[in-house]
UniProtKB/Swiss-Prot annotation:
Residues 1-39, 219-269, 517-559, 620-646 are annotated as: Disordered. Keywords: Activator, Nucleus, Repeat, TPR repeat, Transcription, Transcription regulation. It comes from the Eukaryota. The keyword Transcription regulation applies. TPR repeats lie at residues 693-726, 914-953. Residues 530-547 have a biased composition (Acidic residues). It is found in: Nucleus. Transcription factor involved in erythroid differentiation. Involved in transcriptional activation of the globin gene. This is Erythroid differentiation-related factor 1. Residues 9-28, 253-263 have a biased composition (Low complexity). Pfam families: EDRF1_N, TPR_EDRF1. Its main location: nucleus. It comes from Mus musculus (Mouse). The gene is Edrf1. GO terms for cellular component: nucleus.
Amino acid sequence: MGDPKEAGAEASPSGAAARGGLSLLSQADSEEPSAQGSALFLGGNEVKSRAVVKYSSAPPRTAFARLEEKTDLKLPPANWLRESAKLGPAGTTILGNSKKSKPFSSFGMAYDFIDSVGNDVDVVSDSENIKKLLKIPYSKSHVSMAVHRIGRTLLLDELDIQELFMRSSQTGDWTWLKEFYQRLIDQKWQRKKKSKEHWYQKAILSKFLYYSINGDGAAQPVPSPAEQEESSSSQQTHESEGAAWPAPFEMPSSVSEDPSASSQGREPLEPSCIVGHVASAPKEQNLTTLFNDGENSQGLKNDFVRNILWTFEDIHMLVGSNMPIFGGGRYPAVSLRLRDNNKPINVLTGIDYWLDNLICNVPELVMCFHVNGIVQKYEMIKTEEIPNLENSNFSTKVIKDIAQNILSFLKSNCTKEGHTYWLFKASGSDIVKLYDLTTLCEETEDKYQNPFTMPVAILLYKVACNMMMKKNQNKKHYGTIRTLLLNCVKLLDKSRHPQIIASANYMLSELFQLDEPKKEESSDSPLNENSDESYSEEEEEMADSDENGSYSTSSDPADDNKAVAIIKSVGELSVPEKYKSIHQIRPSCAFPVCHDTEERCRLVLSYVLEGLKSVDSSIKKESDLPAADPSTPIPLKYEDESTRGGPEGLEKQMALFLDKMGSIQKGSCSGQSGMTPGSWQHKMKLQLILKSSKAYYILSDAAMSLQKYGRALRYIKLALQSHDTYCCLCTNMLSEVLLFLSQYLTLCGDIQLMLAQNANNRAAHLEEFNYQTKEDQEILHSLHRESSCQGFAWATDLSTDLESQLSVSCKCYEAANEILQFSDLKSQNPEHYVQVLKRMGNIRNEIGVFYMNQAAALQGERVVSKSVSAAEQQLWKKSFSCFEKGIHNFESIDDATNAALLLCNTGRLMRVCAQAHCGAEDEFKREFSPEEGLYYSKAVDYYLKALRSLGTRDMHPIVWDSVNWELSTTYFTMATLQQDYAPLSRKAQEQIEKEVSEAMMKSLKHCDVDSATARQPLCQYRAATIHHRLASMYHSCLRNQVGDEHLRKQHRVLADLHYSKAAKLFQLLKDAPCELLRVQLERVAFAEFQMSSQNSNVGKLKTLSGALDIMVRTEHAFQLIRKELVEECDQPKNDEATPAADSSPNLNREEVIKLLSIFESRLSFLLLQSIKLMSSSKRKMSSNAEEDIVLQTNKQIYSQLLRATANRNSTLLERIEVVICLLEQLASGSSRSSGSAVP
């Protein structure tokens, strides 16, 4: 801790407000001297002292009146005990006539300067207590002080044993301490009365000070004897009363937690420091009475004239002082003292004077000497000269060592925050003992007999509030805040202080960031590395360490064993750094490390539950409600799905929900427990319920990511139930809370969708959904005190019906969107709005696909009736409506990709509609109907819209390829149906052929055979099939065409072209040997048809040669067939258990046999025709070696083929192998003939 940077009177943010409206003094107006840090050099020993006035209620300084010699101070001045404009409102206090310091004076200062407590300041105390501690080695007087630890700060207050036990005799409390004290000093306690000399000295000092401020004593009448007697008795009464101790047993009647209790006459205070991003918690009403004047003030008001931040060497102290300060000396400020001339100043008095001047930064002391009340003379003494006065010599260095040793002793042993420690030294004793009164009190019947409990708890709470309110507060201090709050809750009785406990538990829940991943473990300043020296309750139980043992080795009476630590001799305090070795930072209060989200949320919910219990216990109307039994399930309203009406019922519930949300906006909701809106119970319960809803939402989201959908639905149900209760209590719904609700409903929609898609694990999901912890039950019971929690039951049912689940999911998204619409959150949260619309589009796509599949299933079940049923048409309409709405959702957020996917699905729906109209007529008489054409055309339109939506393939290649494929399929299907079921009754053959050709070419255009994608083989097969069909169509046209030679030639060229392309594409595929073989056979048939129209043998031979060449190129197809047959034959041998049906799934044996028979016959025919033509041409023409080779080869192959076909016992594989062998011979023969022809 460094020295304060500012000089002079510094203002506390809460000083004036909390002090009855007294204004803070500026540096210019302050009656204090400038608080510049000063180094005093006394006797060669340097002592550093710096004083900064943080607050002062004193009026501007006035010069003291120097009394004439022989003035009789025994006579009262005219202004004695009367108010004066020169004195201001704190006149009697300034002149030292106020009653003694209250036992909670340090708490009053701590409340006013809460920023300094816990970290910046080492000690907070009355200056009288500081002086008493520093005089311990010099004084035989008894010392009795209460010590409290708040973080790094120690609060010191006088613990007046006499006053305490006098009260004990009247009320019966504190008896445990009285008995302990009597055992400790081994004698019966008796109250010691003040001597007459004591009262005489106080009276003469008071009169002297009044004389010193009175410039004209004769101007005012002397008080009458009756007034003097009254004043004197009043003063003695104050002295006899001493401190005003609060009643530790019950709460005073005025300290009511009833929000309707009168608050007239109370001073305004700063609100309690409850942090929360929704709203601030109410101020603690109990705090109000603790700070006000009157019989119930309990002494917690900061009534010091000055609050000074005093730095003595390295010790930082917040000190309260009432010392009178005057002007009129050689310096701007002096302190005024009255001394008996016959009694020399002793060391104790010198230390008193020196410390007072140091603390108040007063550079000079004015001493007035008297004899028997008669003024003799005045003497001016500088502050730095006080330690060197005759008979009052003391070492300032020793005072510094005493201060450092005492602070080290206390900090090392007062380790438990919130505990009351008692620093005690008996009169005439050299032993100083430290006791833990809180621990001793807990051993009694009523552990709340400690009157310090409430002030300490409030201070712990306020310090924690203040730390959380700081915007620049590092999260590493969260451990400190948590420790402060836990100790606060531990100190208080739940039944007596529900508001503080509820607030503290809410703040504890706020420490955990629910909506952020845990990042502290990897940061530079983790939470468990606090710089604060306080620590959590788990770390309190420490074994006897060396440092503690060094204080407890005394063999004093048995009660000494209960002392936390002992200083065996006060002389040790004067030894430099005697206790420095033990003045160390204690283990830091580690913030709990939550390893996962669920653990973190569960911790938050535990604090929320404790807070809710505190609130519920304080509501008066609780007796009117039946007691909640956590073990008894809460009956929930339930409607059977059959009576609820499915989606129609959901529509009604949605309408009711939206109406309810509208009423919330108007503030017409109220709870059932009787809480008064605006009361602390009402506000705190709202905060706690909102926190619980957030925690359950995060738990649900975490379960969702783990695919635990039943658990996720249970948590989101609890979140929505919490929010429903919040809605019932809230009179003015904040936009942020509405945003939370939209997020909850969005997540609920996600969960319902995932449950619909994972129906196979329904039993496990149901088990998770029905499980409930005791903590959840208790929170739910608290919610049921305010609401039925059924507002969102429609969204959280776990249905077994797929359609119902999808509908619920959709309604959740719609509700989330409606909230964003009517609360104008759409523009404020554009990202969430986009996500909601995406989900709406997605769920409508899912529902549209569901209805489309149902329609397709109905279509497949049609056997008797071939007309389209009304049910199918209704499903088409539902599906189309969902797709249309989904497309609108995606288009509204410019999501072209998803809009294209839904347009694609709409195209698919049109194809389903087209397929439904294909079975209207008998299969043999069937024609491609106009309805089919209409729906296929609509499908094409939607696919084209999808492509236009995407723009280019680069935008989203996968979606683009998918839409392209579907469009190609639609064109192909439409062309195939027109080709296979030509509508000849409505259209001419030529028109049909033209339409088929155009559709096929469009299909081919959208069939990408070049891109190396997973769909490439399918595209190649589709393209090959298209070419094959076109070739077959032109071949058929050529056969049936008569007349137009130009058209015939065109058809012949196109047929040859498409056959060639089909063969090439099928050649690339490894799983289409039959298709390749069929194409080649059709090409051979096409060659035979051409040959039939030829007249010359040369032309026929050329055509035959081309046909045989096509036959040779079929070897590849036969090789593939042979390979599959071999694998099929080997399969049973390798694995007898594997059925043969599993092998060669792509090979159709019947089709292979059929094609093989055709192939054998056509090869036989071609070979025979070739042999005939070549033989006849050989007879007519001269011999040709090349032709001889070909002829000879053809004869051999023909002979072998005849023998093979004649053998009826050959297997399919053997026949295939023979064909392959013959084709190889035919190919080699052709190559030899070609080779011999080369010169």
